[in-house]
Amino acid sequence: MNDAFSNAQHKLDALGLRCPEPVMMVRKTVRQMAAGETLLIIADDPATTRDIPSFCEFMDHTLIASETAQTPYQYLIKKGL
């Protein structure tokens, strides 16, 4: 795990969950965060490789980093305003 992932302020384990559950959990978690805080998402659903980046773009959050070469996938997002 690179430093960006290890320094996340919040962590969400979505392993074993299938679409649409991971994105629903991300949305719920992000709502409880302050603007600028970071969230590490760990998932193994292949749909997250498309859904998490789309969620960030649609909701004006920043996808700081992602590792999707193999499972578990990791995503680091920063909450927007």
From Swiss-Prot:
One protein family per Pfam = TusA
Q: What is its main location?
A: cytoplasm
How is this protein named in the record? Answer: Sulfur carrier protein TusA
NCBIfam families for this protein: PRK00299.1 (NF001423)
Question: What are its GO biological-process terms?
Answer: tRNA wobble position uridine thiolation
Task: Please name the CDD domains in this protein's record.
Answer: SirA
- The answer to whether the entry has keyword Signal is no
CC annotations in GO: cytoplasm
| Matches recorded under HAMAP family | Thiourid_synth_A (MF_00413)
What keywords tag this UniProt record? Answer: Cytoplasm
Q: So where's the catalytic machinery, residue-wise?
A: C19
Q: Which family does it belong to?
A: Belongs to the sulfur carrier protein TusA family.
Q: Please state where this protein is localized.
A: Cytoplasm
Q: Which domain of life is it from?
A: Bacteria
Question: Keyword Cell wall biogenesis/degradation: yes or no?
Answer: no
Gene Ontology MF terms in the entry: sulfur carrier activity
Q: What does this protein do?
A: Sulfur carrier protein which probably makes part of a sulfur-relay system.
